[in-house]
């Protein structure tokens, strides 16, 4: 019986050491050495203080800032612990109420409503944490942000263009604009 358990205990100990200690330690070391920014959460700083991650959206609702997608997390917007979609189907009246509420907020903030509203400004993403919007959603907000900040619309457009990322490897995903990075650049523009 003793001979039966000895190999099992040895295999268990070796696999625990390899998969539970050695592999995570090596991957952590490689991540820190080769991809330090990403391994530490892709944090963004302003005036030497961490203000957020470029991977997690933040709530912006003041007219002088670009607004991101709606957050489906509750009870607080952009709460990473509550990540998940709203699960509201296209025929659910609550989804329509949510969309109407966002359109009303855009009107109240002074957005020109003569153009069609980009869908990503009035719907939440699958995770509820999306940090990016489409270039169309950013362009839709340029006039409002420029007016609120007393800037030329062309200057704000140039900033949007600068912070627009293309498709990954030229084929994956869609062009996108990181809202937090764009808003931080706007704040720098005002201070600088």
UniProtKB/Swiss-Prot annotation:
Cited Pfam families: KdpC
Molecular-function GO term, any one: P-type potassium transmembrane transporter activity
Any single GO CC term annotated in Swiss-Prot or TrEMBL for this entry: plasma membrane
Cystine pairs: none
Membrane protein topology class: Single-pass membrane protein
Xref: InterPro entries: KdpC
TM spans (from-to): 7-27
Family according to the record: Belongs to the KdpC family.
Name of the featured protein: Potassium-transporting ATPase KdpC subunit
Gene it is expressed from: kdpC
């Amino acid at each position: 019986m003793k001979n039966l358990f000895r190999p099992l205990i040895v295999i268990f100990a070796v696999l625990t050491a390899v998969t539970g200690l050695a592999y995570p330690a090596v991957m952590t070391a490689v991540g820190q050495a080769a991809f330090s920014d990403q391994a530490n959460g892709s944090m963004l700083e302003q005036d030497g203080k961490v203000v957020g991650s470029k991977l997690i959206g933040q709530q912006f609702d003041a007219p002088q800032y670009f607004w991101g997608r709606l957050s489906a997390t509750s009870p607080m917007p952009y709460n990473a612990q509550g990540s998940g979609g709203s699960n509201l189907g296209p025929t659910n009246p609550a989804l329509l109420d949510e969309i109407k509420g966002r359109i009303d907020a855009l009107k109240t903030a002074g957005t020109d409503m003569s153009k069609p509203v980009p869908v990503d400004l009035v719907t939440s993403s699958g995770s509820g944490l999306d940090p990016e919007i489409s270039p169309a959603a950013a362009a839709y907000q340029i006039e409002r942000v420029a007016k609120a900040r007393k800037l030329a619309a062309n200057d704000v457009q140039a900033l949007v263009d600068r912070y627009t990322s293309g498709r990954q490897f030229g084929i994956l995903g869609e062009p996108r604009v990181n809202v937090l990075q764009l808003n931080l650049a706007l704040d720098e523009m005002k201070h600088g």
